[in-house]
Amino acid sequence: MRREGMAGVAARLLGALCLAACLPPALGRDAGAQWTLEKYSHQPRILGSDAIQKVVASTDISEMWENDLRPILIERYPGSQGSYIVRQHIKHRLQTLKAGWEIEEDTFQRYTPYGYKTFSNVIGTLEPSAKRHLVLACHYDSKFFGQQWQGRVFVGATDSAVPCAMMLELARALDNELQLIKASSTSRPDLSLQLIFFDGEEAFVRWSPSDSLYGSQHLAQKMASTPHPPGSTTTNQLQGIDLFVLLDLIGARNPVFPNYFPNTLRWFQRLQAIEQKLHNMSLLKNHPVQSQYFHSTLHRGLVEDDHVPFLLRGVPVLHLIPSPFPAVWHTMKDTEENLDKATIDNLNKILQVFVLEYLNL
């Protein structure tokens, strides 16, 4: 991702983003396309204290650390052996769960400053036939630094090994609840969960429209041209996304997450409410009242990240990236040693409650 800026191209892009953030996707002529509007009136099923206690008891930061985070903390720039290893790890972890994830590997080639490179996004979907999907997304690639660091390896702990591990831990911890998605029920909307792990978020040399966001640009374009539900002539996979939740730069102590987009404010406020509820129940670690993660401030700067290709196509976005960025951003100090386990554990709990509430489980 690139830091916020307001000049030149960035300002023009920000205007386009703001316009896209305020407009729903265009509907087709088919009256059946009205289902694409259901996301705007969707209501969560608020969890009570007993259900929240159950979520907290199911998640395990130590298990996540050993089984998901550490295997990802390797050099994994696009096309590297580490990239292949991490991709296989992600697929294996989802395939071992009972919920029944369907795994797609979206592989393609793009020209980069180092010639043509192969990229592979990993998409895990529960019930692809469901009309609507809540999407959680992150990028699994690490930034390519070449030889400039005298043999040292950049592992991108916050950027974005931790978000990847958090998403895998969510799938594991909520495995029993997520199995209910396949059970037909008149009390639940036709709604499911999709996890997207992007390749090629980072620039190889210098951030530009042609050297960044390789995976998300490709997948957004592909989804926009893929009919959904299958056989539809009026709606596509992008219109099937209820909410696109992007996690990035997570893992440092005391992060501050502002609200980036007014059209998803109510979902940001759910995160605030969940954080406050867990705090009041004494379920968050090292979380004094003044250390609130989710702040009501509307962030008016620009952060270019994997959400941009989706936002520009009208997809509602909830961007979970702290501002300011962690001090270790794009340095060799972005390592396991500089992560804060309590913060990550707290955010796991908040995100897992949010997902269950959104899915009405």
Spell out what each predicted region is.
Residues 2-361:
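Secretory-pathway/membrane protein signature
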